[in-house]
């Protein structure tokens, strides 16, 4: 059964998301696909090689080789922490 969840962005993640919308529509669409997949499959299953972060709270999924979608989920809310760059940078 599909979860009904809300999606919230941190300020930084929102600006990154809008930057993708403006500069690279393909990446923007990939991020949206990953968010839909999280809603369908939960935190650790589905597209983008989902994994739990080792040294901080949250999860990541690959957008591409250089960029990760970093997020956590609490009380049926996906909180997007970052959608540009890599969590190790």
Q: What is each model feature region?
A:
Residues 28-36:
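PIN-domain endoribonuclease scaffold, especially VapC-family toxins
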Residues 2-7, 12-29, 47, 61-68, ...:
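Enriched for short, Lys/Arg-rich terminal
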Residues 36-62:
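A short, surface-exposed loop/turn module that caps and links secondary-structure elements
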């Amino acid at each position: 059964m599909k979860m009904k969840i809300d999606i919230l962005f941190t300020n930084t993640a929102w600006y990154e998301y809008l930057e993708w919308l403006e500069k690279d529509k393909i990446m923007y669409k990939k991020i949206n696909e990953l968010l839909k997949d999280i809603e369908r499959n939960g935190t650790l299953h589905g597209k983008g090689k989902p994994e739990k972060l080792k040294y901080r709270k949250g999860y990541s999924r690959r957008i591409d080789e250089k960029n990760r979608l970093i997020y956590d989920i609490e009380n049926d809310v996906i909180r997007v922490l970052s959608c540009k760059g890599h969590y190790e940078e």
